[in-house]
Curated annotation (Swiss-Prot):
Protein name: Maximins y/H16
Keyword Cell inner membrane applies: no
Keyword entries, A-Z: Amidation, Amphibian defense peptide, Antibiotic, Antimicrobial, Cleavage on pair of basic residues, Cytolysis, Fungicide, Hemolysis, Secreted, Signal
Tissue: Expressed by the skin glands.
Role this protein plays: Maximin-y shows antimicrobial activity against bacteria and against the fungus C.albicans. It has little hemolytic activity. Maximin-H16 shows antimicrobial activity against bacteria and against the fungus C.albicans. Shows strong hemolytic activity.
Species of provenance: Bombina maxima
Assigned protein family: Belongs to the bombinin family.
Phenylalanine amide: modified positions: 68
Signal found in the keyword field: yes
GO biological process, one term: defense response to fungus
GO cellular component, one term: extracellular region
Pfam families assigned to the protein according to its UniProt record, in alphabetical order: Bombinin
Length: 142
């Protein structure tokens, strides 16, 4: 009889343990499902933020391109004015060489390659002031 009780109690303990393991597995799988769902939500939010960030960066890049494109055109005009001033000054100092320089002209690519982008940011306003001043002097002289 004691043996039957021992077997019955052992059976109850084993079945209780099996139920607790099964419940643990179910709760674990439920947690995993919840974690996966939350990760999907986080990824969705992250993807949305990433797409918004990309579009904002594209717009910002486009704006910078337009702004610096205009500035490059202004720099180009300043360089043209400076070339004209240099040609005029050369013609005053050396009249025989002025015609040769005008015939040859200045290569725009060579002049553009002399300045890096950093130099343009620093020298751009200075060159525009010098160009405007020299242009005004030439108009007064001419």
């Amino acid at each position: 009889m004691n043996f039957k009780y021992i077997v019955a109690v052992s059976f109850l303990i084993a079945s209780g343990y099996a139920r607790s393991v099964k419940n643990d597995e179910q709760s674990l799988s439920q947690r995993e499902v919840l974690e996966e769902e939350s990760l999907r939500e986080i990824r969705g939010i992250g993807g949305a933020l990433l797409s918004v960030g990309k579009s904002a960066l594209k717009g910002l890049a486009k704006g910078f391109a337009e702004h610096f494109g205009k500035r490059t055109a202004e720099d180009h005009e300043v360089m043209k004015r400076l070339e004209a001033v240099i040609r005029d000054l050369d013609s005053l100092d050396h009249p025989e060489e002025a015609s040769e320089r005008e015939a040859r002209g200045f290569n725009q690519e060579e002049i553009a390659n002399l300045f890096t982008k950093k130099d343009k940011r620093i020298l751009g306003p200075v060159l525009s002031l010098v160009g405007n001043a020299l242009g005004g002097l030439i108009k007064k002289i001419g």
